[in-house]
């Protein structure tokens, strides 16, 4: 048994504590790792609040180590041609089960769901907020760009964006989505929310040629507006200014009332990507006119969750590109750096938060 410090919850009940745990060293592993930075997102906070009923502890355990947005350092590794001691790596969150999608490396599209697949720090598999991690090389993605530094901790949330655009590429082919110049230039993309995930969606949308607007029901901070401006992203307080004629709508809020409010602004042949989840959000009474609007305009609504290993690789490539073009803006995405003992950050967001990370070492 290895005694180590960890941040744990009791899923799905919730709660959080920074404590000492005993974790057995596995008989077989490829790499021994330690966390450098761990990101905190709405999923972590939802778990701590007891708001995510789908979460659960590993079998036979009465706790779950939190943390899925991880940047790890290799402390030791078996002989291989990919990673070595001292390298920085990003671990895959979702681990495969036995379905056909899982068997081909697409556990993000698991055909069975729980308990076939597991997600580190979320469903049945301990996360990365602990001193020591043992893992297999196939579940690690090497950070090739030494200039990224702590920005590489954004790989995990960004891989969700890469996957969502893969979904968009597939479903948008049901009609001619591109403009008459064969590009997406001038097509309108609206992102509901202004947290870190929304920022990453907006940057990726700009890369693809979209005219991108992030929206929320309040005005935004100067820091957020400055970052948006540098990337060419607009912002709208939708209580004052509701965007119209939307081609691609992405929801990061998980709030059905807000989503349906914007859905009625989507163009013919438009696409809606649902990404945010919020099990405690109030219901929305969908009526016949809502259904008519979707059907008569050939609107496609698609949920998108998690990602495959290829999307982690794509995310790291995008982070490197953005960091070269907008180094100051990318540094500004991480707005607060906490210590492991600061568990209050799971209950209260620091003022002006875009992304809060825990510096583990």
Swiss-Prot record:
What are its GO biological-process terms? galactose catabolic process via D-galactonate; non-phosphorylated glucose catabolic process; protein tetramerization
Q: Which residues bind Zn(2+)?
A: 41, 68-69, 156
In alphabetical order, the GO MF annotations are: D-glucose binding; galactose 1-dehydrogenase (NADP+) activity; galactose 1-dehydrogenase activity; galactose binding; glucose 1-dehydrogenase (NAD+) activity; glucose 1-dehydrogenase (NADP+) activity; glucose 1-dehydrogenase [NAD(P)+] activity; NAD+ binding
Please summarize the temperature-related behavior of the activity in one or two sentences.
Answer: Thermostable. Retains full catalytic activity after 9 hours at 55 degrees Celsius, and at 75 degrees Celsius the half-life is approximately 3 hours.
Q: Which reaction does it catalyse?
A: D-glucose + NAD(+) = D-glucono-1,5-lactone + NADH + H(+); D-glucose + NADP(+) = D-glucono-1,5-lactone + NADPH + H(+); D-galactose + NAD(+) = D-galactono-1,4-lactone + NADH + H(+); D-galactose + NADP(+) = D-galactono-1,5-lactone + NADPH + H(+)
**What Enzyme Commission number(s) apply to this enzyme?**
1.1.1.47, 1.1.1.120, 1.1.1.48
Entry binding sites for NADP(+)? 216-218, 275-277, 304-306, 349
Q: Where does substrate bind?
A: 43, 119, 156, 160, 306
Please give the cofactor(s) recorded in the UniProt entry for this protein. Zn(2+)
Its keywords, alphabetically, are: Carbohydrate metabolism, Metal-binding, NAD, NADP, Nucleotide-binding, Oxidoreductase, Zinc
HAMAP family, from UniProt?
Glucose_DH
Q: What is this protein's function?
A: Catalyzes the NAD(P)(+)-dependent oxidation of D-glucose to D-gluconate via gluconolactone. Is also significantly active with galactose as substrate, but not with mannose or glucose 6-phosphate. Can utilize both NAD(+) and NADP(+) as electron acceptor, with a marked preference for NADP(+). Physiologically, may be involved in the degradation of both glucose and galactose through a non-phosphorylative variant of the Entner-Doudoroff pathway.
Q: Which family does it belong to?
A: Belongs to the zinc-containing alcohol dehydrogenase family. Glucose 1-dehydrogenase subfamily.
The annotated subunit structure for this chain is: Homotetramer.
Recorded protein name is Glucose 1-dehydrogenase
Organism of provenance: Thermoplasma acidophilum (strain ATCC 25905 / DSM 1728 / JCM 9062 / NBRC 15155 / AMRC-C165)
Q: Which gene encodes it?
A: gdh
